[in-house]
C-alpha cells in the first residue's frame, strides 16, 4: 500500500501593534474564534499555529476561552505552536541582539502560557536574508517556512515536497517550501478541488501550506464562504475521509524525515511583493519611502542607546517600547495600507517617544547635535528643548523631519508624500490584478480584486 501524502497545514495570526480594539475584536469574531472552534471539532486535523506575541497577549487578556481552546489542542497533540519575533518585526531589518530578544520574548510567552517551547519560527512577511540564520539557530529554533519560489530562485528543481537545509557561519536551519498552488487555492477554490490538488502530491511526500489565518473570515467574502457556507467544515471532513491524506504538524514531519539537502537562498520575500515594489526585497521599501527609512533609522538609534546602558538599567518597559517600535506594519505596505495608514506610523513614533524619554532620564542627550540620523550620507540637526524633540535637514533648506512631543507621544511632522504606484494602472483600467488566475467556481482572492472603501482618483 502506498504511503499517504503528509499535509502540513500552518496558519499565521497577527494584528498590528497599535491597531484599534474593535478591529481586533472583529477579527476574533469573524476569524480566530470560528476557525479554532471548527478545528477542535476535527481532532484528526493537525495544524501548526503561529500567533504574534502582541496579539497572543491581547487574546489572553480579552478572549481567554480561545486561548484555553488552543491549550487543549496543544495538550492533545492536534496543534503545535510556532515561534518568531514577539511584535512581528522583519527580523532581517533589526539588529542581531534585538532579533534574539524578540525571538526569546515570544518563546517565553508561549512557554509561560502553554508550557511548551516552539521549535519552528514564522518569518515575518517571509522576508529571507541569511543573516537571520544564526539568530534563529541560537534561539533554539530549527525550521522556518518560506515560499517555494525562494527555493526555485536558488536553482532547486523538481517537486518541492519536503524540507531543505541551509547554514550561516556553520549554524544550520531547515527550510520548508510553501506551495504557491495551495496558497492560491485555499480558501478560495471549492473544498473538493483543494483535496484533489493535495492528493496529487506523490506518496510519502509533503503538501505544504502556511499562510495568514485572516484569509479564513476577514478577507473579502471569506466569512460567508468559509463559515456560513461551510467551506472549512467541508474541507476538514473531506481531508479526514481521504485515504491519501494524513495531516501532520511541521515539527512532527521535521523530526521523522530527513532533509533533502543543502540550499543557499537569495535575499527575497514572497512573490506578491513584486506587485508593490520591483525587486521583491523588503528593505527596498525604505528607499522608496524615506518616511519609513526615517522611522527605521530612528528605531535603530534608540536600540543602540538602549543596549549601551548597563544591563542593570535596561528596564523591561524600555525593551517593550523598543520591540513595539520594531513591529513591521508601519514601515511598508502590501494589501492592507501599512505605511500609508497614519495610526500605524503614529504607533511607531509613540513607542519611540516612550523609549527616548526613558533613555533620556538615564543618559541625557545634548540640547543639539549634528549626525547622519537616517544614514543617507547627509547630516541632520537634532534639537531638544523641554518636552520636544526636533530634527532638521540643512541639505534640504532646513526641512523639519520630525517634531515629537514626548508627553503627547506624537510626532507633528509625521506626514507621507504621495507617490505614483505601479498598481495604479490596474485602478485606471478597472481590471483584475491577476486575470490569468481568476477561475470559477469559488471566490476571488484579494490579490485578484480591485475594490476600495472610498473612491480613489489615481
Q: For the regions a protein language model found, what residue spans apply to each?
A:
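Active-site and substrate-binding clefts of carbohydrate-active enzymes
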Residues: 2-33, 40-42, 160-173, 177-181, ...
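Generic structural signal for well-ordered alpha-helices
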Residues: 32-39, 67-71, 100-110, 133, ...
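Short, well-structured secondary-structure segments
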Residues: 5-95, 101-102, 117-123, 142-148, ...
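Alpha-helical scaffolding within the catalytic cores
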Residues: 33-34, 61-76, 154-167, 191-198
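Gly/Pro-rich turn-and-neighbor structural signature
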Residues: 97, 112, 116-117, 122-166, ...
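Positively charged, amphipathic and often flexible ligand-engagement surfaces
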Residues: 90, 149-160, 176-189, 193-194
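Acidic-aromatic substrate-binding/catalytic surfaces of carbohydrate-active enzymes
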Residues: 25-29, 97, 101-104, 386-458
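CE4/NodB-like, metal-dependent polysaccharide N-deacetylase domain
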Residues: 96-125, 196-213
Amino acid at each position: 500500500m502506498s504511503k499517504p501524502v503528509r499535509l502540513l497545514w500552518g496558519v499565521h495570526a497577527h494584528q498590528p501593534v497599535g491597531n484599534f480594539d474593535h478591529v481586533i475584536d472583529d477579527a476574533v469574531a469573524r476569524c480566530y474564534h470560528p476557525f479554532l472552534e471548527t478545528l477542535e471539532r476535527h481532532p484528526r486535523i493537525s495544524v501548526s499555529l503561529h500567533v504574534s506575541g502582541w496579539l497572543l497577549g491581547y487574546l489572553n487578556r480579552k478572549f481567554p476561552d480561545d486561548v484555553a481552546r488552543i491549550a487543549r489542542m496543544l495538550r492533545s497533540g492536534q496543534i503545535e505552536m510556532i515561534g518568531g519575533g514577539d511584535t512581528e518585526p522583519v527580523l532581517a531589518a533589526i539588529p542581531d541582539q534585538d532579533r534574539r530578544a524578540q525571538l526569546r520574548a515570544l518563546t517565553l510567552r508561549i512557554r509561560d502560557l502553554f508550557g511548551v517551547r516552539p521549535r519552528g519560527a514564522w518569518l515575518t512577511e517571509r522576508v529571507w536574508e541569511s543573516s537571520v540564520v544564526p539568530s534563529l539557530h541560537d534561539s533554539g529554533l530549527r525550521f522556518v517556512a518560506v515560499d517555494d519560489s525562494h527555493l526555485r530562485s536558488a536553482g532547486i528543481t523538481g517537486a518541492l515536497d519536503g524540507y531543505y537545509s541551509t547554514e550561516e557561519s556553520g549554524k544550520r536551519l531547515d527550510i520548508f517550501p510553501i506551495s504557491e498552488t495551495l496558497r492560491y487555492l485555499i480558501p478560495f477554490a471549492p473544498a473538493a478541488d483543494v483535496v484533489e490538488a493535495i492528493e496529487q502530491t506523490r506518496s510519502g511526500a509533503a503538501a505544504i501550506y502556511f499562510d495568514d489565518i485572516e484569509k479564513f473570515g476577514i478577507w473579502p467574502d471569506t466569512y460567508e464562504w468559509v463559515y456560513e457556507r461551510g467551506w472549512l467544515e467541508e474541507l476538514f471532513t473531506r481531508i479526514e475521509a481521504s485515504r491519501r491524506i494524513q495531516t501532520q504538524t511541521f515539527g512532527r514531519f521535521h523530526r521523522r524525515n530527513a532533509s533533502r539537502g543543502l540550499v543557499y537562498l537569495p535575499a527575497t520575500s514572497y512573490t506578491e511583493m513584486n506587485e508593490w515594489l520591483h525587486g521583491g526585497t523588503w528593505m527596498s521599501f525604505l528607499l522608496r519611502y524615506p518616511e519609513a527609512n526615517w522611522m527605521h533609522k530612528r528605531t535603530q538609534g534608540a536600540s543602540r542607546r538602549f543596549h549601551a546602558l548597563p544591563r542593570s538599567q535596561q528596564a523591561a518597559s524600555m525593551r517593550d517600547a523598543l520591540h513595539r517600535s520594531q513591529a513591521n506594519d508601519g514601515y511598508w505596505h502590501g494589501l492592507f495600507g501599512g505605511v500609508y495608514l497614519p495610526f500605524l506610523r503614529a504607533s511607531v513614533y509613540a513607542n519611540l517617544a516612550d523609549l527616548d524619554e526613558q533613555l533620556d532620564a538615564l543618559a541625557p542627550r545634548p540640547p543639539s547635535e549634528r549626525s547622519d540620523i537616517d544614514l543617507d550620507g547627509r547630516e541632520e540637526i537634532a534639537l531638544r528643548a523641554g518636552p520636544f524633540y526636533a530634527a532638521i535637514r540643512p541639505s534640504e533648506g532646513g526641512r523639519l523631519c520630525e517634531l515629537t512631543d514626548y508627553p503627547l507621544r506624537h510626532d507633528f511632522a509625521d506626514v507621507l508624500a504621495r507617490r505614483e504606484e505601479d498598481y495604479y494602472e490596474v485602478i485606471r483600467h478597472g481590471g483584475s490584478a491577476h486575470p490569468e488566475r481568476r477561475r470559477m467556481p469559488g471566490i476571488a482572492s484579494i490579490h485578484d480584486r480591485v475594490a476600495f472603501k472610498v473612491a480613489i482618483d489615481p
